[in-house]
Protein backbone atom coordinates (compact mmCIF):
# COMPACT_ATOMS: atom_id res chain seq x y z
CA UNK A 1 0.00 0.00 0.00
CA UNK A 2 2.91 2.38 0.69
CA UNK A 3 4.21 2.61 -2.88
CA UNK A 4 0.76 2.93 -4.55
CA UNK A 5 -0.17 5.73 -2.14
CA UNK A 6 3.09 7.55 -2.79
CA UNK A 7 2.56 7.21 -6.55
CA UNK A 8 -1.12 8.19 -6.46
CA UNK A 9 -0.37 11.49 -4.75
CA UNK A 10 2.85 12.06 -6.71
CA UNK A 11 3.47 15.01 -9.00
CA UNK A 12 5.23 15.65 -12.30
CA UNK A 13 7.52 18.69 -12.57
CA UNK A 14 8.13 20.96 -15.56
CA UNK A 15 10.74 18.60 -17.01
CA UNK A 16 8.30 15.71 -17.04
CA UNK A 17 10.00 13.92 -14.15
CA UNK A 18 7.61 12.12 -11.82
CA UNK A 19 8.15 12.49 -8.07
CA UNK A 20 6.47 10.21 -5.57
CA UNK A 21 4.76 11.78 -2.57
CA UNK A 22 6.49 10.23 0.45
CA UNK A 23 4.45 12.18 3.07
CA UNK A 24 1.18 10.64 1.78
CA UNK A 25 1.69 7.11 3.19
CA UNK A 26 3.19 8.61 6.36
CA UNK A 27 0.06 10.73 6.81
CA UNK A 28 -2.09 7.65 6.26
CA UNK A 29 -0.21 5.82 9.02
CA UNK A 30 -0.60 8.86 11.29
CA UNK A 31 -4.36 8.79 10.78
CA UNK A 32 -4.47 5.09 11.69
CA UNK A 33 -2.42 5.77 14.83
CA UNK A 34 -4.84 8.53 15.82
CA UNK A 35 -7.81 6.20 15.30
CA UNK A 36 -6.11 3.59 17.47
CA UNK A 37 -5.41 6.16 20.19
CA UNK A 38 -9.03 7.30 20.20
CA UNK A 39 -10.17 3.67 20.41
CA UNK A 40 -7.88 3.19 23.43
CA UNK A 41 -9.43 6.12 25.27
CA UNK A 42 -12.94 4.85 24.48
CA UNK A 43 -12.00 1.42 25.83
CA UNK A 44 -10.52 2.99 28.98
CA UNK A 45 -13.71 4.99 29.54
CA UNK A 46 -15.92 1.90 29.34
CA UNK A 47 -13.52 -0.10 31.52
CA UNK A 48 -13.72 2.53 34.26
CA UNK A 49 -17.48 2.61 33.85
CA UNK A 50 -17.60 -1.16 34.36
CA UNK A 51 -15.48 -0.91 37.52
CA UNK A 52 -17.80 1.77 38.89
CA UNK A 53 -20.88 -0.36 38.20
CA UNK A 54 -19.31 -3.35 39.96
CA UNK A 55 -18.57 -1.20 43.00
CA UNK A 56 -22.15 0.06 43.02
CA UNK A 57 -23.47 -3.50 42.97
CA UNK A 58 -21.24 -4.42 45.88
CA UNK A 59 -19.30 -7.03 43.94
CA UNK A 60 -15.83 -7.92 45.09
CA UNK A 61 -13.21 -5.91 43.16
CA UNK A 62 -10.41 -7.57 41.26
CA UNK A 63 -7.29 -8.39 43.24
CA UNK A 64 -4.79 -5.51 42.84
CA UNK A 65 -1.42 -5.88 41.16
CA UNK A 66 1.48 -6.83 43.43
CA UNK A 67 5.19 -6.81 42.64
CA UNK A 68 5.56 -10.40 43.78
CA UNK A 69 3.30 -11.39 40.87
CA UNK A 70 6.19 -10.51 38.55
CA UNK A 71 8.58 -12.65 40.57
CA UNK A 72 6.17 -15.58 40.42
CA UNK A 73 5.77 -15.24 36.65
CA UNK A 74 9.45 -14.85 35.73
CA UNK A 75 10.36 -17.88 37.84
CA UNK A 76 7.87 -19.99 35.90
CA UNK A 77 9.78 -22.02 33.28
CA UNK A 78 6.66 -22.43 31.16
CA UNK A 79 6.32 -18.65 30.92
CA UNK A 80 9.81 -18.33 29.45
CA UNK A 81 9.14 -21.05 26.89
CA UNK A 82 6.08 -19.14 25.66
CA UNK A 83 7.89 -15.77 25.82
CA UNK A 84 10.90 -17.04 23.86
CA UNK A 85 8.67 -18.66 21.25
CA UNK A 86 6.78 -15.39 20.96
CA UNK A 87 9.87 -13.20 20.51
CA UNK A 88 11.57 -15.58 18.08
CA UNK A 89 8.42 -16.20 16.05
CA UNK A 90 7.31 -12.60 15.68
CA UNK A 91 10.88 -11.43 15.13
CA UNK A 92 11.02 -13.80 12.18
CA UNK A 93 7.77 -12.43 10.72
CA UNK A 94 7.28 -8.70 11.37
CA UNK A 95 10.81 -7.48 10.46
CA UNK A 96 10.68 -9.77 7.42
CA UNK A 97 7.46 -8.09 6.26
CA UNK A 98 9.22 -4.73 6.51
CA UNK A 99 11.82 -5.87 3.99
CA UNK A 100 9.53 -8.17 2.00
CA UNK A 101 8.46 -5.59 -0.60
CA UNK A 102 12.09 -4.80 -1.42
CA UNK A 103 12.82 -8.54 -1.53
CA UNK A 104 10.07 -8.98 -4.13
CA UNK A 105 11.69 -6.29 -6.30
CA UNK A 106 15.34 -7.27 -5.84
CA UNK A 107 15.07 -11.07 -6.02
CA UNK A 108 11.80 -11.86 -7.78
CA UNK A 109 11.75 -8.90 -10.23
CA UNK A 110 8.26 -7.80 -9.20
CA UNK A 111 7.13 -4.35 -10.34
CA UNK A 112 7.73 -1.91 -7.44
CA UNK A 113 4.12 -0.72 -7.71
CA UNK A 114 2.92 -4.28 -7.09
CA UNK A 115 5.69 -5.40 -4.73
CA UNK A 116 3.57 -4.85 -1.64
CA UNK A 117 0.74 -7.02 -2.96
CA UNK A 118 2.46 -10.35 -2.30
CA UNK A 119 3.48 -9.57 1.33
CA UNK A 120 -0.01 -8.11 1.77
CA UNK A 121 -1.41 -11.62 1.39
CA UNK A 122 -0.06 -12.42 4.86
CA UNK A 123 -2.34 -10.24 7.03
CA UNK A 124 -5.31 -10.78 4.71
CA UNK A 125 -4.90 -14.54 5.01
CA UNK A 126 -4.48 -14.28 8.78
CA UNK A 127 -7.91 -12.64 9.03
CA UNK A 128 -9.46 -15.84 7.66
CA UNK A 129 -7.10 -18.52 8.93
CA UNK A 130 -6.53 -17.49 12.55
CA UNK A 131 -10.18 -18.04 13.64
CA UNK A 132 -10.19 -21.38 11.81
CA UNK A 133 -7.03 -22.57 13.54
CA UNK A 134 -8.34 -21.25 16.85
CA UNK A 135 -11.47 -23.34 16.38
CA UNK A 136 -9.29 -26.34 15.54
CA UNK A 137 -7.32 -25.82 18.76
CA UNK A 138 -10.56 -25.63 20.76
CA UNK A 139 -11.71 -28.95 19.31
CA UNK A 140 -8.57 -31.06 19.42
CA UNK A 141 -6.21 -29.26 21.81
CA UNK A 142 -2.58 -30.32 21.19
CA UNK A 143 -1.32 -26.73 21.36
CA UNK A 144 2.34 -27.77 21.54
CA UNK A 145 1.98 -29.88 18.40
CA UNK A 146 0.32 -27.05 16.49
CA UNK A 147 3.05 -24.61 17.54
CA UNK A 148 5.79 -27.02 16.45
CA UNK A 149 4.12 -27.51 13.05
CA UNK A 150 3.81 -23.74 12.57
CA UNK A 151 7.44 -23.19 13.57
CA UNK A 152 8.64 -25.84 11.10
CA UNK A 153 6.61 -24.15 8.36
CA UNK A 154 8.23 -20.82 9.23
CA UNK A 155 11.72 -22.34 8.98
CA UNK A 156 10.79 -23.86 5.62
CA UNK A 157 9.55 -20.50 4.32
CA UNK A 158 12.70 -18.60 5.24
CA UNK A 159 14.84 -21.39 3.78
CA UNK A 160 12.98 -21.15 0.47
CA UNK A 161 13.32 -17.37 0.38
CA UNK A 162 17.06 -17.67 1.11
CA UNK A 163 17.86 -20.26 -1.57
CA UNK A 164 18.64 -18.94 -5.08
CA UNK A 165 15.93 -21.00 -6.79
CA UNK A 166 12.82 -20.15 -8.81
CA UNK A 167 13.23 -16.38 -8.70
CA UNK A 168 9.76 -15.81 -10.14
CA UNK A 169 6.73 -14.05 -8.69
CA UNK A 170 4.44 -17.09 -8.46
CA UNK A 171 6.96 -18.99 -6.33
CA UNK A 172 7.21 -16.03 -3.95
CA UNK A 173 3.41 -15.96 -3.77
CA UNK A 174 3.18 -19.66 -2.87
CA UNK A 175 5.84 -19.31 -0.16
CA UNK A 176 4.10 -16.24 1.24
CA UNK A 177 0.82 -18.18 1.47
CA UNK A 178 2.62 -20.91 3.45
CA UNK A 179 3.98 -18.18 5.72
CA UNK A 180 0.39 -17.03 6.20
CA UNK A 181 -0.55 -20.50 7.45
CA UNK A 182 2.36 -20.48 9.92
CA UNK A 183 1.59 -16.91 11.00
CA UNK A 184 -1.97 -17.95 11.84
CA UNK A 185 -1.28 -21.41 13.25
CA UNK A 186 1.29 -20.54 15.93
CA UNK A 187 -0.54 -17.61 17.62
CA UNK A 188 -3.87 -19.46 17.60
CA UNK A 189 -2.27 -22.09 19.85
CA UNK A 190 0.34 -19.96 21.63
CA UNK A 191 -1.82 -17.28 23.26
CA UNK A 192 -4.46 -19.71 24.65
CA UNK A 193 -1.58 -21.68 26.20
CA UNK A 194 -0.70 -18.85 28.59
CA UNK A 195 -3.72 -19.37 30.93
CA UNK A 196 -2.68 -23.01 31.27
CA UNK A 197 0.56 -22.06 33.02
CA UNK A 198 -0.36 -18.73 34.66
CA UNK A 199 -3.17 -18.21 37.22
CA UNK A 200 -6.05 -16.05 36.01
CA UNK A 201 -5.35 -13.24 38.50
CA UNK A 202 -1.84 -12.83 37.00
CA UNK A 203 -2.76 -13.16 33.33
CA UNK A 204 -2.64 -9.43 32.59
CA UNK A 205 0.86 -9.14 34.05
CA UNK A 206 2.00 -12.25 32.16
CA UNK A 207 0.75 -10.94 28.82
CA UNK A 208 2.41 -7.58 29.49
CA UNK A 209 5.73 -9.27 30.24
CA UNK A 210 5.48 -11.41 27.11
CA UNK A 211 4.92 -8.32 24.98
CA UNK A 212 7.82 -6.62 26.77
CA UNK A 213 10.13 -9.49 25.79
CA UNK A 214 8.68 -9.50 22.27
CA UNK A 215 9.34 -5.80 21.77
CA UNK A 216 13.02 -6.24 22.62
CA UNK A 217 13.21 -8.68 19.74
CA UNK A 218 11.23 -6.43 17.40
CA UNK A 219 13.67 -3.64 18.24
CA UNK A 220 16.87 -5.63 17.73
CA UNK A 221 16.11 -7.90 14.77
CA UNK A 222 15.43 -5.10 12.21
CA UNK A 223 18.73 -3.50 13.24
CA UNK A 224 20.45 -6.85 12.71
CA UNK A 225 18.84 -7.33 9.29
CA UNK A 226 19.81 -3.82 8.21
CA UNK A 227 23.39 -4.35 9.38
CA UNK A 228 23.68 -7.65 7.49
CA UNK A 229 22.27 -6.09 4.31
CA UNK A 230 24.62 -3.10 4.46
CA UNK A 231 27.66 -5.16 5.42
CA UNK A 232 27.38 -8.24 3.22
CA UNK A 233 24.56 -7.89 0.69
CA UNK A 234 25.14 -4.65 -1.20
CA UNK A 235 24.88 -4.91 -4.96
CA UNK A 236 25.55 -2.36 -7.69
CA UNK A 237 23.80 1.01 -7.81
CA UNK A 238 21.19 0.91 -10.58
CA UNK A 239 19.65 4.19 -11.77
CA UNK A 240 20.71 5.87 -8.57
CA UNK A 241 19.20 3.21 -6.31
CA UNK A 242 21.17 0.79 -4.15
CA UNK A 243 20.44 -2.86 -4.87
CA UNK A 244 20.82 -5.74 -2.43
CA UNK A 245 21.43 -9.46 -2.84
CA UNK A 246 18.92 -11.11 -0.52
Segment roles from a protein language model:
Residues 200-234:
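A late C-terminal transmembrane helix in Major Facilitator Superfamily
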Residues 129-142, 229:
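Helix-to-loop junctions at the C-terminal end of transmembrane segments
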Residues 1, 87, 120-124, 208-216:
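Transmembrane alpha-helical cores of Major Facilitator Superfamily
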Residues 2-10, 101, 133, 221-229:
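Small-residue (Gly/Pro/Ala) motifs that create kinks and tight helix-helix packing interfaces
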Residues 42-68:
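Flexible cytoplasmic inter-helical loops of multi-pass small-molecule transporters
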Residues 1-47:
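Helix-loop-helix hairpin linking two adjacent transmembrane segments in secondary transporters
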Residues 143-193:
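C-terminal transmembrane helical hairpin of 12-TM major facilitator-type secondary transporters
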Residues 76-127, 187, 191, 221-222:
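Extracytoplasmic gate region of multi-pass secondary transporters
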Amino acid sequence: LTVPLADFFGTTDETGTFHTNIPAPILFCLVMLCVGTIAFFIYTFYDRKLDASLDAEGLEPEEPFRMKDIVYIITNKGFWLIALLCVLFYSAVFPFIKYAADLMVQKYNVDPKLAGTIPGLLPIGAIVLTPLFGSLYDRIGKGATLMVIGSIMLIFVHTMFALPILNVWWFATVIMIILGFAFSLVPSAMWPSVPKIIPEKQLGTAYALIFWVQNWGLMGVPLLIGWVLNSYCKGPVVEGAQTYDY
